[in-house]
Structure formats: C-alpha cells, structure tokens
C-alpha cells in the first residue's frame, strides 16, 4: 500500500505591487514553508521620480509643489523641511506669528496622517468599521486646511520667511471647536479598538523590536518610541516654538505592533494639546519676513553694501543659497524627515539629499517577518506605517 507524503518544497510568492495591503507600490518576494515566512525581500523603486535631481534644477519656491508628493498624507512636513534648510543657510528670522501658524498646521497634518494610518491598518487585520470612522475626522482637518490654504491636500502653504497667507477670520475658533470634538472621537476609537480581544490577539507580541535594536537600525518616530526610547526632535531640537509649549513625549516599552499603535493614538491627543496652546497663545504681527540678512558677504562698492536683500515669493531666482552645507530635520509622523543641503551661491541647490523616515524604517521588515505567519505580514507592515512616495522619492 502506497502512503502519500506531503510535499515539503518551499514556495516563493510575490506580494504586491498590486496588493491592497502594500500601502502603495511595494513588492515583497516571500519564501514560505507552508504558512511560515522563511525569507522576505522587498523590491522598491516603482514610484521613483528622481526628486533629488529635480531639486537641483529648481529654485526653492519652484520646488515646493514637488515636495508635497513625497509623503502625500503629511504634506506640511515636507514643505517645512524644504524651507527650513534655506532659512537656516540664509539666517532668516521667522516672525513669531508665522512660527505659531506653522506649528498648528504641522500638528493638524500629523493628526490627518495618523488617522489615515489607523483606518487602513485596522482594515488590514480585519476590522472594517474604523476605516470608515476615520474619514469623518479627517474631513474636518481637511476643511481647516482648505479654509487656511485653499487646498485640501498638497497645500503649498509654507514660504521662506513665513507662510503664504495669514489665518482667515474665524479660523481659530473653528479649529478650537475641532480640538474639543476630536478628543471625544479618539476616546471612541480607544473604546472600539484598544481592548478588543480579536485586535489584541493579532497585534500583541507581533513584530517585537528592542530599544538597542531600534537604535542600531536607525529607526525613528513612533517605531523608536514604541521600543522604549524617549526621542522626539520637537523636544531635542526645539525647532519653531515647540520649546514654549507644554507637552510630553509619548512612548511605550514593549516594542511590538500594539505598542506602536498605542504611541500613535496617544500622539494624536498630544497634538491636540499642542494645537490648543498654540491657538490660545498665538501672537499678532506679520506672518512673513521677506528680508534676508547678508552676512559674510564682501561689500559691493557700486551699491554701497546693502545689508539686506529681498526674498521674492514668486518663483524668480532671487534667493541665493550661500556656499555652505547643512543637515536639517523635523519630527514627521513617520519619523525623522531630514534633508542634507549644499548651496553654491546660486538660486539652485548643488545637492539636495532626502532622508525619508519610511525608507529607513522599512529596512527592518525582513527581520521582523521571518519565522512569523503569512497573515502577520499585514500587521507588521501596517504598524511600520510607510508611504511609498517618500520611500522611493
């Protein structure tokens, strides 16, 4: 009598780039032994558009509409990093009111990004209801953006020396009303999700990253803070006016997918706290500074050495980047978003290197999914929170 034996061959499966859980055009080549993942190889580059090379052929103002296509769910942060570099190179003083407006916009953008992380993350692991709920609050954030900037996404709002336009009449009251409402919405999400036994079964103890391991991999943002490291660039660098506001770094020590979920949920409430303080303490005065102080320049005898130069808000190449190099960074929703900028005394940057948080956070994925089940890939990838626009650039 012949006994049929089960085949033990390994199976190679392509996940993506057209998979609904890939959050864009990511492709994973998986080696499976039954349902166990033996190996995982991410294939990137499907959304590569040459963003760094484009920057070398544009003035800073001309380049602003391009940068909102990196992380297209948190566009205020890409705009902030794009103008922070030239501002620091040119020693441009940003008015206090403009700095407060920037903080408000950045934190609203962080909330919108975390909301659109939460919905698909829950849908990936089988919970459909939160996916529809998050769009209520996200629409309110986009209504605020539309009232202030004219655009719901891709705002093109930040400018060298300030912002493009002041806040419209009644906007501050509208934003304060949103803050009060949003806190009740977050508590509703937590009742719905956080203690749900099926949700906990899917995320608890899945994709564990230790603190030292997170540092060695160069992780940042919620990925790092969920592993027990209290590191937030808003506290470390104190850029804009974050040092004047009272808020806390939210972190967890477990390092699993649940910890990353908890960090992002609590970050949304901290963002509301920051926005409320900024709205109540926003000073008067100008919302832009269009003068650049010219230090370290030889006096031009023909013009008697003007100490100031005018920054044009139009795309004309009037703002020259000094011959220096600089690394500047902000705390984006996904982690540390930075650019390395080299100027050469012209209107165009000589080098514009982007440090995208999603690209670096994604590197740890193959290690996290090994020896896990195939279904856990969705949980782990969702907890990393990637946007392929900034990964591929």
Curated annotation (Swiss-Prot):
Annotated EC: 7.1.1.-
Topology of this chain in the membrane: Peripheral membrane protein
GO CC annotation: chloroplast thylakoid membrane
Keyword list, A-Z: Chloroplast, Membrane, NAD, NADP, Plastid, Plastoquinone, Quinone, Thylakoid, Translocase, Transport
Disulfide bonds: none
GO molecular function terms noted in the UniProt entry: NAD binding; oxidoreductase activity, acting on NAD(P)H, quinone or similar compound as acceptor; quinone binding
Enzyme class per UniProt: translocase
Catalytic activity of the protein: a plastoquinone + NADH + (n+1) H(+)(in) = a plastoquinol + NAD(+) + n H(+)(out); a plastoquinone + NADPH + (n+1) H(+)(in) = a plastoquinol + NADP(+) + n H(+)(out)
Main location: plastid
Subcellular location: Plastid, Chloroplast thylakoid membrane
Keyword Plastid among UniProt keywords: yes
Quaternary structure annotation from Swiss-Prot or TrEMBL: NDH is composed of at least 16 different subunits, 5 of which are encoded in the nucleus.
Protein's name in the database: NAD(P)H-quinone oxidoreductase subunit H, chloroplastic
Provenance organism: Oenothera biennis
Gene behind the chain: ndhH
């Amino acid at each position: 009598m012949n006994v049929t034996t089960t085949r033990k061959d390994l199976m190679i499966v392509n996940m993506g780039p057209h998979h609904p859980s890939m959050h864009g055009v990511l492709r994973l080549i998986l080696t499976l032994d039954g349902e166990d993942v033996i190996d995982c190889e991410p294939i990137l580059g499907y959304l590569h558009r040459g963003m760094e090379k484009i920057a070398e052929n544009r003035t800073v103002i001309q380049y602003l509409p391009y940068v909102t296509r990196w992380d297209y769910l948190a566009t205020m942060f890409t705009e902030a990093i794009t103008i922070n570099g030239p501002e620091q190179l040119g020693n441009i003083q940003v008015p206090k009111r403009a700095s407060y407006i920037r903080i408000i916009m950045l934190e609203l953008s962080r909330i919108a990004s975390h909301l659109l992380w939460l919905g698909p993350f829950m849908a990936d692991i089988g919970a459909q209801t939160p996916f529809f709920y998050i769009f209520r609050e996200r629409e309110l954030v986009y209504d605020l953006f539309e009232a202030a900037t004219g655009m719901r996404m891709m705002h093109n709002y930040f400018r060298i020396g300030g912002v493009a336009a002041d806040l419209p009449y009644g906007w501050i009251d509208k934003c304060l009303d949103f803050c009060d409402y949003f806190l009740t919405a977050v508590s509703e999400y937590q009742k719905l999700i956080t203690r749900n036994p099926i949700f906990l079964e899917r995320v608890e103890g899945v994709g564990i990253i230790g603190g030292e391991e997170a540092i060695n991999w160069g992780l940042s943002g919620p990925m790092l803070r969920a592993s027990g490291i209290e590191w937030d660039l808003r506290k470390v660098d104190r850029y804009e006016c974050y040092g004047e506001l009272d808020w806390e770094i939210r972190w967890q020590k477990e390092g699993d997918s649940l910890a990353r979920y908890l960090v992002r949920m609590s970050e949304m409430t901290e963002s509301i706290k920051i926005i409320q303080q900024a709205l109540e303490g926003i000073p008067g005065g100008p919302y832009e500074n269009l003068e650049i102080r010219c230090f370290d320049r030889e006096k031009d005898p023909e013009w008697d050495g003007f100490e100031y130069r005018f920054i044009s808000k139009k795309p004309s190449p009037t703002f020259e980047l000094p011959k220096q190099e600089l690394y500047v960074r902000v705390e984006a929703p996904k982690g540390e978003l930075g650019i390395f900028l080299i100027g050469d005394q012209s209107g165009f940057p000589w080098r514009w290197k982007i440090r995208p948080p999603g690209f670096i956070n994604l590197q740890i994925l193959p290690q996290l999914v090994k020896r896990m089940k195939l279904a856990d890939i969705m949980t782990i990838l969702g907890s990393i929170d990637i946007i392929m626009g900034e990964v591929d650039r």
